[in-house]
Swiss-Prot record:
GO annotation, biological process: signal transduction
Protein name: COMM domain-containing protein 4
Keywords in alphabetical order: Cytoplasm, Nucleus, Transcription, Transcription regulation, Ubl conjugation pathway
Subunit composition and interactions: Component of the commander complex consisting of the CCC subcomplex and the retriever subcomplex. Component of the CCC (COMMD/CCDC22/CCDC93) subcomplex consisting of COMMD1, COMMD2, COMMD3, COMMD4, COMMD5, COMMD6, COMMD7, COMMD8, COMMD9, COMMD10, CCDC22 and CCDC93; within the complex forms a heterodimer with COMMD8. Interacts with RELA, RELB, NFKB1/p105. Interacts with CCDC22, CCDC93, SCNN1B, CUL2, CUL3, CUL4A, CUL5, CUL7.
Major localisation: cytoplasm
Disulfide bridge positions per record: none
Organism: Bos taurus (Bovine)
Length: 199
């Protein structure tokens, strides 16, 4: 069976297995868990102590707690990626065996944060790291008493790259011949044109 929140594909087996784990906690606690997972997906971090307190009644082992967070994260982010409305998501989760109250509780949380979650996912999509700064210098030796030939110019690039937003920037240095720099510049301009046509 195909599900919209899975991108019109079959639901992964591990998600099916964890639906029964979600059913072990109350719908109210599931809503609070969803709030914590959404906070994490939106970049606010996750409070594991609060999650452990919420799952204490169900006597979850640490593996069950992690699996619960993972399955909620998958369901919420995947539904947002595929622009699934709350009603459809609720229906699909019930088809997978999640009780109606639980599905309604999860979907209320999802609907409240759907647009901000989609914006966050869009901002993080296809982004390996962030360019913080660029520096460059051209060395061109006109003549030298030690060299018989005049060397071609060298372009020294220094890129400052942050692995994630808020992380300290790491310098990446490289030296290129003038020809290689021209090829790099042409490729970057072509990539910029293609990306501007996409978004």
């Amino acid at each position: 069976m195909r599900f919209r929140f899975c991108g019109d594909l079959d639901c992964p087996d591990w998600v099916l297995a964890e639906i029964s784990t979600l059913a072990k906690i109350s719908s109210v606690k599931l809503r609070l868990l969803c709030g914590q997972v959404l906070k994490d997906l939106l970049g606010g971090g996750i409070d594991y102590e609060k999650i452990l307190k919420l799952t204490m009644d169900a006597r979850f082992e640490s593996g069950d707690v992690k699996a619960t967070v993972a399955v909620l994260s998958f369901i919420l982010s995947s539904a947002a990626k595929h622009s699934v409305d709350g009603e459809s998501l609720s229906s699909e989760l019930q088809q997978l065996g999640l009780p109606k109250e639980h599905a309604a509780s999860l979907c209320r949380c999802y609907e409240e944060k759907q647009s901000s979650l989609q914006a966050r996912l869009r901002a993080c999509s296809l982004r390996v790291n962030r360019l913080v700064g660029v520096g460059w210098r051209v060395d061109y030796t006109l003549s030298s008493s030690l060299l018989r030939t005049v060397e071609e110019p060298l372009v020294h690039l220094r890129l400052e790259v942050a692995a994630s937003p808020g992380a300290p920037a790491q310098p990446v240095a490289m030296s290129l011949s003038a020809d290689k720099f021209q090829v790099l510049l042409a490729d970057l301009k072509q990539a910029q044109t293609l990306m501007s046509n996409v978004g």
